[in-house]
Amino acid sequence: MKEYWTSLASLLGVLAFCQSLMNSVFPPELRFAISKLFNKFFKLFSTFCYFDITEIDGVNTNELYNAVQLYLSSSVSIAGNRLSLTRAVNSSSVTFGLSNNDSIVDTFNSVTVVWEHIVTQRQTQTFAWRPMPEEKRGFTLRIKKKDKNLILDSYLDYIMEKANEIRRLNQDRLLYTNSRGGSLDSRGLPWESVPFKHPSTFDTLAMDPVKKQQIMEDLKDFAECQSFYERTGRAWKRGYLLYGPPGTGKSSMIAAMANYLRYDIYDLELTEVKSNSELRKLLMKTSSKSIIVIEDIDCSINLTNRNKKQSTGSYNEPEMLTGSGLGDDLGDGNTITLSGLLNFTDGLWSCCGSERIFVFTTNHIEKLDPALLRSGRMDMHIHMSYCTFSSVKILLRNYLGFEEGDLNDVVLKELAEVVDRAEITPADVSEALIKNRRDKERAVRELLVDLRSRVERNEKNGKSRVQNVSLEEQENRAFDSLYAEENGGEEEEIEDNICKSSDDCS
């Protein structure tokens, strides 16, 4: 054993002497050339190729590095031995990551690859316009040469898609509102945000189940059909108009849409917008996968002069009143035009962003300009009506835990008879049930009493839904009359609640 250690020490001494001799005899340029030659020789016979993905590319952040980091976080939680744990701002879950200089094996299309997380110390900077992190981070991807052309491009595309999905699932949705008077927030953005945690879903929405299913299918088709919009040359956007009496669930519908698609919401307050250019800047700062909401649009727009000639013979441009609201003098504030909004919903500016939904709400559809309602701007008109028997059953299930079989047939029959004639909103039914939610039987009894009293009052005032046309028909009839008046009395048929106008303001 002693002879072994003696021989090893002698060998190390000889190697050290040879190295010092080479350093003194051979110049650095020659040594570098020899080292480069050996590396080429090694690569020639190596069966692997390597790809480095650094955290910072020059002075810019490498998007691919962040995508790889997110993608591997879904695998290392199971396969890794030493992990790093992080939780980003606005994130709802903890993210797993590879520790420094650790590696993990991944498989894609039956091809095995190896990822290694490389962390090294960066050289000290004497001066730099942009300070760099002290550590230099990156991933190294090792793939067999025979598999490189087979999977590399598709594998990286898959990583980007997977990372976007993980980011969307982990990040809490946000509710944005435009800053007052066009001011900027601390990050220089015109939108202020808070976490969006509204519990409304399509399951809890008091609405006809058939209509809900149609809306859900339409939303799903929109989110999954990017190729359709590209093929047909249309901007990837969709518009929904929610109309009906107050308290019928228009805001809950918007929240259910956002929760169903996992989109952010931008609540655009038009009274804080001063001009068309400011409106354009606001809308350009919205992100994809978002819902842009303008509530009570009939209260923000002056449409009384639309297509009516002044004494000079010219047409008035409809204006959105901003600043202090509709009740103030127009001379005291700035105005934006209806065309400024329409140009962004389906004009040239509609392509500045993708996968966005515009939602307008109103209590009086007959007050809206036909140009705002035509197809291509508001693609789907959704009437939020008074409670029906099916929506009352949903509310009984939500607030009292009642299923249809829990109520006796007499109560169900009476509910079915009076609810349509009562003209009661889901908000009123919800309030009646919340007050007595600890006593379910009493809650149902008081709801029936309230429904009967409303029926008697409506019949006394001649407003019974049985004797008169429905609210939805009244809205369409009012809009039809407005349309006919603007076209010299010509009558046009309005089908499927989609209003068509021959006057194109865009």
Swiss-Prot record:
Protein residues bound to ATP: G244, P245, P246, G247, T248, G249, K250, S251
Record-listed E.C. numbers: 3.6.1.-
EC top class, as a word: hydrolase
Biased composition regions of type Basic and acidic residues, renumbered to the chain: 497-506
Taxonomic lineage from the root: Eukaryota, Viridiplantae, Streptophyta, Embryophyta, Tracheophyta
Signal peptide stretch: 1-20
Name of the protein in question: AAA-ATPase At4g25835
GO biological process annotation, one example: response to stress
Pfam families: AAA, AAA_assoc
GO MF annotations, alphabetized: ATP binding; ATP hydrolysis activity
SMART domains: AAA
Catalytic reaction annotation: ATP + H2O = ADP + phosphate + H(+)
Cofactor: Mg(2+)
Region of interest called Disordered, as start-end residue ranges on this chain: 462-506
Nucleotide-binding keyword on record: yes
Family recorded in the similarity comment: Belongs to the AAA ATPase family. BCS1 subfamily.
Positions with biased composition (Acidic residues): 487-496
UniProt entry keywords in alphabetical sequence: ATP-binding, Hydrolase, Magnesium, Nucleotide-binding, Signal
